[in-house]
Design a protein with these regions (language model features):
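Sec/Tat signal peptide C-region and signal peptidase I cleavage site
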Residues: 23-27
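Bacterial N-terminal signal peptides
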Residues: 11-22
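Bacterial N-terminal signal peptides that target proteins for export
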Residues: 2-12
Length: 178
């Protein structure tokens, strides 16, 4: 075999292996999503975004107990090309750069496979604003969380109402009617 043919066969083989590996990774990722977090069967995936930012906690006192309580997320949302798509903030609310906004309410929460990370969620959209990219979303999954958990200490009588920001990232999958 000539050098060019060997090079071509080797390159083609590597491309096929990479393609098969990427399919296996995609299948594995879908298989790892717990059944309780699956969207309704009459919905389809509309959009996938990656969030990078902070979970903001406030030190609160209830019945002489001190706990870090989630105040709000504060994150930027990026599309698959890593372009800034919008932001995620209190509500919880997701807002696209086109002005579309959805607010949701957690329906299901499951511990993250990473014990140091915030839970995975299935969120039901409760309100819409605008007619852009998020207008058709009715269900949102929060998966692949990294970080964001409330501190285990530091909330006491000396720190009541103090806020702390904990870095996190997550993938958000937006679903809507087929």
């Amino acid at each position: 075999m000539s050098h060019r043919i060997r090079l071509f066969v080797s390159a083609a083989f590597l491309i096929v292996v990479a393609f098969i590996s990427s399919l296996a990774v995609l299948a594995t990722q879908e298989a790892e999503v717990p059944l309780q977090l699956q969207p309704p069967v009459d919905e389809q995936l509309l959009l996938q975004l990656h969030a990078k930012g902070d979970q903001i906690y406030a030190c609160k006192s209830e019945s002489a107990q001190f706990n870090w309580t989630l105040k709000a997320p504060d994150a930027q949302l990026f599309d698959r090309k890593e372009l800034l798509f919008g932001k995620h903030f209190a509500g919880p609310t997701w807002q696209a750069n086109d002005g579309t906004r959805v607010t949701g309410k957690a329906a299901v929460s499951i511990a993250s496979p990473d014990a140091e990370s915030i839970p995975w969620l299935l969120v039901k959209v409760v309100s819409h604003e605008g007619n852009g990219m998020l207008a058709r979303a009715t269900t949102i999954q929060r998966l692949n969380t990294k970080g964001g958990k409330a501190p285990g200490s530091g909330c006491d009588s000396d720190h009541v109402n103090q806020e702390v920001r904990v870095p996190y990232s997550a993938d958000y999958f937006f679903y809507g009617p087929k």
